[in-house]
């Protein structure tokens, strides 16, 4: 049997690693092009993030400027001047409560015109335009306030008015309102209140002999 001969041209067949090395050696520009693409993409991402940060910072600055404008940022001297002016107006004004809903500013002005020169009458209303039942009367003279206080419990439209000196509201400061005098709560007893009618387990109207009387009664 004859042996078959196989001819190998060019020597031994190179392995896969050697072939890859040869391909890289033959195409050195492939890796450089891929690296350039990655660098370009990374640079674009950095530019995009930087643009987003700049837009966010600009939006924050715009929002801050808008808030400062709405809050009416003023210097302390201007705020103090406005507060002083408000206190001066309040010193010439009175609060009028229990005003009839059908009462007009002209009628309120006529009711207080004997006290002094009425500069302004303001009847407060709700969001629907309905009167709330109280008003503010501003006079030209400070002395008119004391005269107006004398009209407390005077009647207008058959209703007793409640006339008080107007308070000045200080911004950012909650004012303390003292409790009104109540003749039924002016004095508080230290002893707890006991009902005159108490349930007794010994029967109606009976109490154990070892108990002391609940209340002292000097007159029998």
Swiss-Prot record:
**The RRM domain covers which part of the protein?**
92-168
- Which CDD domains does this chain map to? RRM_II_PABPs
Instruction: Indicate the segments annotated as coiled coil, or none if absent.
Output: 34-74
Region (Disordered), start-end ranges: 1-24
Is Coiled coil one of the keywords? yes
Q: Where is this region: Necessary for homooligomerization?
A: 78-219
Tell me which domain of life the UniProt entry assigns to the organism this sequence originates from. Answer: Eukaryota
Where it sits in the cell: the answer is:
Nucleus speckle; Cytoplasm
Question: Motif Nuclear localization signal: where?
Answer: 165-172
Q: Which GO terms describe its cellular component?
A: cytoplasm; nuclear speck
Q: Which InterPro entries match?
A: Nucleotide-bd_a/b_plait_sf (IPR012677), RBD_domain_sf (IPR035979), RRM_dom (IPR000504)
UniProt keyword terms in alphabetical order: Coiled coil, Cytoplasm, Nucleus, RNA-binding
Q: Name one GO molecular function term.
A: mRNA binding
| Function of the molecule | Involved in the 3'-end formation of mRNA precursors (pre-mRNA) by the addition of a poly(A) tail of 200-250 nt to the upstream cleavage product. Stimulates poly(A) polymerase (PAPOLA) conferring processivity on the poly(A) tail elongation reaction and also controls the poly(A) tail length. Increases the affinity of poly(A) polymerase for RNA. Binds to poly(A) and to poly(G) with high affinity. May protect the poly(A) tail from degradation.
Its domain comment says:
The RRM domain is essential for the recognition of specific adenine bases in the poly(A) tail, but not sufficient for poly(A) binding.
Binding partners and assembly = Monomer and homooligomer. Binds RNA as a monomer and oligomerizes when bound to poly(A). Forms a complex with cleavage and polyadenylation specificity factor (CPSF) subunits PAPS2, FIPS5, PABN3 and PABN1. Interacts with CSP3.
Protein name in the entry: Polyadenylate-binding protein 2
Instruction: Give the species this sequence originates from.
Output: Arabidopsis thaliana
């Amino acid at each position: 049997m004859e042996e078959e001969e196989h001819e190998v041209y060019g020597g031994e067949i190179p392995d896969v690693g050697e072939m890859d090395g040869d391909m890289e050696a033959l195409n050195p520009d492939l890796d450089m092009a891929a690296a350039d693409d990655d660098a370009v993409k990374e640079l674009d991402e950095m530019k995009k993030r930087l643009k987003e940060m700049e837009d966010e910072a600009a939006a924050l600055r715009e929002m801050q400027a808008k808030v400062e404008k709405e809050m009416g940022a003023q210097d302390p001297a201007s705020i103090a001047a406005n507060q002083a002016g408000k206190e001066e107006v309040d010193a010439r004004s009175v609060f009028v409560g229990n005003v009839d809903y059908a009462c007009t500013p002209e009628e309120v002005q006529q009711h207080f015109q004997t006290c002094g020169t009425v500069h302004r009458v303001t009847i407060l209303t709700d969001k629907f335009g309905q009167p709330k039942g109280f008003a503010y009367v501003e006079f030209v003279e400070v002395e008119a306030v004391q005269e107006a206080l004398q009209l407390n419990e005077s009647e207008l439209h058959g209703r007793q008015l409640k006339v008080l000196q107007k308070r000045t509201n200080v911004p950012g400061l909650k004012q303390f309102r003292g409790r009104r005098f109540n003749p039924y709560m002016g004095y508080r007893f230290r002893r707890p209140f006991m009902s005159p009618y108490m349930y007794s387990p010994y029967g109606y109207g009976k109490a154990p002999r070892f108990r002391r009387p609940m209340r002292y009664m000097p007159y029998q």
